[in-house]
Each structure stands twice: as C-alpha cells, then as structure tokens.
C-alpha cells in the first residue's frame, strides 16, 4: 500500500483523524498515550474502501463474516482501562477481527498476542498489520474462549466479543497484578474489569462493572 493510502487523503486525512481524537477527549478519554496510539493508526485501511469516508466517525462498521470494527470510543476506552495509566507488557487479545484494536494495542504494549477464530478475517488482519510494519504482534487462528495457555500469564487480556460469562480459562491466564477487560451478556451487555490481586494468602479476582456496551457474541470453535 502506498504511503499516501496509509496517511490518507480527503476524508481519511490526518486532519480528520485529529477531529476524531478531539471527540474522544470530549467524551472522557484522558490517557494521552492512548490518544496518541489512535492518532498513529490509520483506521481507514482496516475497512472496505466503500466505507473509508466513515472510518473516523465514532461508530462501528461491518468487516464481513457478521463481525464489526469497534467504534473508536470503545477502542480507546478499553485500551485506557487496560493500561491504567502505566506501561503494558504482554497482552492477549481475544478477537483480532480486522486488526485495528490489535494495532492500537501494539502501540501501548511490549508484546501483543491476538487470537481469531475466523481464518479469512485473520488473514486480512495480518495483511493490514504487515502494511503498518508492526513487529510486536503475533496472530493465531484458534478458539479464543480458550486463550493461549501455552504463553500465559498475560499482564493484560482484552476480549472484543461479548461472553455469556467470564471464562475461567482466561482468568487462569491473567498474571497477578494483571487486568482483563471483557464485555459480558447477551441482550444486555456490561463491560467488566477483572483485576487479579495479590493477597496475604495468595491472590484473588476482583470484578467491577463499568458501563453498558454492545458487541458481537464470543463464540467457541474455529472456521
């Protein structure tokens, strides 16, 4: 892809991206590192060309296979929660999708491991991420509900689809001191923060309800 396509022209220009960042700030995103990450990633390359003029609007867009690219606000919000004002080491993302959230995470993390169950989506995401030359990302075609136990523990886990309940398999892969952000629910969904806290007798998980959200469902298996 040409440098012009990556930087964007017209509706996909840097100026349009900056307007998106101002809107995110107005909606309460305070972490400058997160805002810089969203400003550095060209969202328009992750959507179909026919939708590129809407890439920097604060809304989700279809990416095929019944999946969507999350609205910029929720990408920023979940990244801000996961970061918690500090650097991130090893992060697991469940649901690569088109790769946009993955790319944002790569800007605020040392390592990002991302799992996607739909192979064609994964292949498309891999192409986008290669264009951006992001070297700290590893993608895997696998059942995201199982995580990546062979690479655990993770300092942060982000789930980008709504689970019926918080999977025990993912809890067990969260490092002590780590944080997981996950939407939970079916018709009504709530974004949860799960913290793995050290205690005098070992460790415990603390769950906090954050806000209402709307995601595609988290499904098991692969295709």
UniProtKB/Swiss-Prot annotation:
It is found in: Cytoplasm. It holds the Pfam family PCMT. GO terms for biological process: methylation; protein modification process; protein repair. GO terms for molecular function: protein-L-isoaspartate (D-aspartate) O-methyltransferase activity. It comes from the Bacteria. Gene3D superfamilies: Vaccinia Virus protein VP39. Its EC number is 2.1.1.77. GO terms for cellular component: cytoplasm. This is Protein-L-isoaspartate O-methyltransferase. The lineage of its organism: Bacteria, Pseudomonadati, Pseudomonadota, Betaproteobacteria, Nitrosomonadales.
């Amino acid at each position: 892809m040409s440098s012009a396509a990556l930087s964007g022209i017209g509706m996909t220009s840097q100026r349009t991206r900056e307007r998106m960042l101002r809107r995110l700030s107005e909606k309460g995103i305070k972490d400058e590192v997160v805002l810089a990450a969203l400003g550095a990633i060209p969202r328009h390359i992750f959507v179909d060309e026919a939708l590129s003029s809407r890439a920097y609007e604060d809304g989700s867009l279809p990416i095929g296979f019944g999946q969507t690219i999350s609205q910029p606000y929720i990408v920023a919000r979940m990244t801000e929660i996961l970061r918690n004002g500090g650097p991130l080491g090893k992060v697991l993302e469940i649901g690569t999708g088109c790769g946009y959230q993955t790319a944002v995470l790569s800007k605020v993390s040392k390592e990002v491991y991302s799992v996607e169950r739909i192979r064609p989506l994964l292949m498309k995401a891999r192409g986008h991420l290669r264009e951006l030359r992001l070297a700290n990302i590893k993608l895997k075609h696998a059942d995201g509900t199982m995580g990546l136990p062979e690479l655990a523990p993770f300092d942060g886990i982000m789930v980008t689809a709504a689970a019926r309940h918080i999977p025990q398999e993912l809890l067990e892969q969260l490092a002590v001191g780590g944080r997981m952000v996950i939407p939970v629910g079916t018709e009504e969904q709530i974004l949860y923060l799960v913290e793995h806290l050290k205690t005098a007798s070992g460790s415990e998980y603390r769950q906090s309800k954050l806000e209402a959200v709307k995601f595609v469902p988290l499904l098991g298996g692969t295709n």
